[in-house]
Amino acid sequence: SPLLRKPLSDCFGDDPEAIQTMHFYEGSEHERHQDQYYLPDCMSAWIAMTIVDQENGALRVQPGSHKGRLITKTDVPLEFLQAETYEDQQKNRYFPEVDKVFIENGNEEVSIFVNQGDVVLFHGRLIHSGSTVLKKGSPRHALACHYIPFQSENWDRDWPRISFDGKRRIKYRSND
């Protein structure tokens, strides 16, 4: 859709490529995080498919945190070890680091309430989370679509990259 392509292109200064879409069917109550830790160079388009409010788990963001420090996999490597699950590594190592950056930034968190069909665009460095769901079991359908610039050399996965024209390419990482 040109309605999404144009603002993404304007933000990137380059053509966007889709790299991942996730469907949240209820509020996630996800810890604070930065998408670029997982998806280098990304920007997110969070599309509400239902009304999103405090009852069903609003998106929470720290305004201005996209200008702050990015936690990278060099800072906090998560490895597949038998002694500790990936989820435990995030809980014990990654999320506490994000909380430190959150405090460094010094800005308060705000809730984002949206109507069905609204799109929230945000930088992949923005610290965000899912708020507590007040009405358990209430639906909160949202798509979290992640994009990177066409020229991105920082993409570290062998996933397909799909343009808004439907062209699919895989830019394989080097083994260097």
Region spans (language model):
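Short, function-defining helix-loop hinge/capping sites that tune catalysis or transport
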Residues: 41, 58, 71, 131-133, ...
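Short, conserved beta-strand element in jelly-roll/cupin
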Residues: 38-54, 113-116, 121, 146-151
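Extended, compositionally biased low-complexity polar/Lys-Gly-rich tracts
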Residues: 8, 109-113, 143
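Non-heme Fe(II)/2-oxoglutarate
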Residues: 75-78, 116-121, 125-176
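Double-stranded beta-helix
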Residues: 54-127
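Conserved double-stranded beta-helix
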Residues: 1-62, 66-68
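A short beta-loop-beta micro-motif enriched in histidine and acidic residues
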Residues: 31-42, 107-108, 114, 138-139
